Amino acid sequence: MGAALTIAIDGPSGSGKSSVSKGVARRLGLAYLDTGAMYRAATWWCLHRGEDLADQAAVAHAVRVMPLVMGLDPSGPTVHVDGTDVGEAIRSTEISTAVSAVATNLDVRAELRRLQRAVIEAERTPSGFAGGRGVVAEGRDITTVVAPDADARVLLTASEEARLARRSLDVHGTADAAAVEATKDQVLRRDRDDATVSQFQVAADGVVTVDSSELDLEQTIDAVLAVVEQVTGRVVGPRQGS
């Protein structure tokens, strides 16, 4: 495919960032970095250490010394903290409820941005997970603050109805009215909290918006690949499932 490719994908909760980003990475043989999982891992670590999440200085210090290892395989991404696989634990309701307190800490954001940029840069070298082919990185701030010079930058959006249904399926295994209602506060509160420290609801200059409200997963992956080809001028691969 030629030179290393960095693809940055941002968007609100439930827009499909993770599934689409993993799918794009699998199609193109790239590494996959879930920056949101890094904030969740930081939250797990702080709670594991017994930190008061309201103590911003203590939380920032804890995150600076956090022994975090991100597995970048899009077919099975992993998250380890201090040798513990926290991939399932960081998706718990406890972490989902607490993560905003960590993610809105500006010193934490600065530290995790540093780590994220280091991963992205490493994936442009032959020693990276994908052998220098590049990375798909997804999450808050990724298109504007973390990787504003990415080869392709996408803002993935969807209607509130579609986002709530997707997150309900993800968390509860169903998108019936009760599940959607149970998920609504968590999704909208996270977006509201994150909006105080990052811009992810309106595309910045050079960022292409893809609305997935009426698209299924494979169609959305195709749409993102089309954007990558459009903005890079590179044929990035066949348009079929992995």
Mark where each language-model region is.
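P-loop (Walker A) phosphate-binding loop of NTP-binding proteins
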Residues: 12
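Hydrophobic anchor at the beta1->P-loop junction of P-loop NTPases
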Residues: 9
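ATP-dependent NMP and nucleoside kinases share a basic, alpha-helical "lid"
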Residues: 87-173
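Small-molecule kinase domains that catalyze NTP-dependent phosphoryl transfer to phosphate-bearing small molecules
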Residues: 71, 116, 120-124, 139-145, ...
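N-terminal phosphate/diphosphate-binding loop that engages ATP/GTP or pyrophosphate donors
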Residues: 26-94
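Hydrophobic positions on the alpha1 helix immediately C-terminal to the Walker A/P-loop
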Residues: 20
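Conserved lysine of the Walker
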Residues: 17
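Pre-Walker A (Motif I) flank of P-loop NTPase domains
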Residues: 2-6, 131-133
